[in-house]
Amino acid sequence: PPDVADYTTRRVLVCDRQEVFLSFIFNGFFRKLEIGLLLWPDYPKLVANQIHDHLAAGSKTTLYLLHDCNRAGYDFKETVQEAFQEHGKKAHIVDLGMRFRQASNLGVPIRSDTAREDSSDLDPLQFGDSGEQQEARLMLRSGCFAHLEELPPLRMLRWTYSRIATRTQDVGYG
């Protein structure tokens, strides 16, 4: 059967935390959807190297970013874009990370921790002008967060699958 390193050139699911990454590895998500899995920034090293080699050869790769709903999650796309900027538009980056409204709709608890309060001003351009985006900005400033792994594993896989699968050959968790 195919291994996790076999599906790394066309599209890659990039996880920001090990717990989420392992859920996708142990459940064989990469086999169901033919997608590479990467724990940011470079684990497994073979996958990270193949992505850079593929992009350097002039081929396109879509990187799907999966992250928690927290300050680091909201900054994750910018971090990945900076790391792949040398490849220009060949690295297509799609942010699939959880947002506060999604967490609420999925029944994921939104927690608050005063130790996570961030008095620095969050870049308003990153959040835009919509009510939902301004609400997220305020929640992040007050230390709110929601973790992906609070979803049951199969539900997390299906939620992610539904946001990536685009063709009939993408059979799996749908």
Predicted regions mapped to residue ranges:
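Nucleic-acid enzyme cleavage-core boundary/entry regions
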Residues: 1-61, 71-174
